[in-house]
Amino acid sequence: MIELKDTNVILTGATGGIGNSILENLITTGANVLATGTNEDKLNLIQKKYKNVQTEKFDISNHLEIENFINKANESLGGRIDILINNAGITRDNLSIRMKDEEWNEVIDINLTSTFLLSKSVVKKMLKSKKGKIINITSIVGHTGNIGQANYTASKAGVVAMSKSLALEYGKKNINVNCISPGFISTEMTDKINDEYKEVLKSKIPMNRFGTPNDIANTVIFLCSKLSDYITGETIHVNGGMYFS
């Protein structure tokens, strides 16, 4: 079992299906977690349930407050941030010809720009500690494209390219930057897909099933651990073989 005792972690998007699974797995490792999200009720439930978790309602689209948020998080975690997990993200699907400027801008702002600004602010803290890990959750469609998601696919592809650049810039400073690219994962979002189309999607997956949030969380824990210390600038695909089929 991987242990992350005395490891300080910031997790964004902690109240969603994948985010909550990441949080629960982090807790089993003994990590100290600051979990963020926009759903105050769910954050309150997290705070009551787990003793080694701090929660903070924070909208990552508020770019002007990101550095201030990281400064406060650094203080509340005892002056050291070891790991940042950028999991928060949104979709605003539409065919490209119908896509409104605000649909494009909102997705790029939150999924790409906010991820960059959070990483930038955290790197400043990690440079002082001379170590750190940044894990960015992307998506299979950032590699394959997808109908009706020009904004989302561009944002996730951008995160992959940005992560490679950060890995090159800060590798010598002992800061690892990696991505995890989920395929189709069983969440509230995929639960809304009708059964017939689910079977069509599964037929394109060599393992013939959707993944679980825990599949993603297990990969996150690996990248958080010392087992991944010599891995940086990489994207781990967790999609049952769909990307390669």
List each language-model region with its residue ranges:
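Active-site helix of classical SDR
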Residues: 119, 155, 163
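Residue(s) in the substrate-gating loop at a strand-loop-helix junction
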Residues: 139
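Substrate-binding pocket helix/loop in short-chain dehydrogenase/reductase
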Residues: 95-96, 100-108, 190, 201
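Short, small/polar-rich loop/turn modules that mediate ligand/substrate recognition or access, typified
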Residues: 171, 176, 231-233, 239
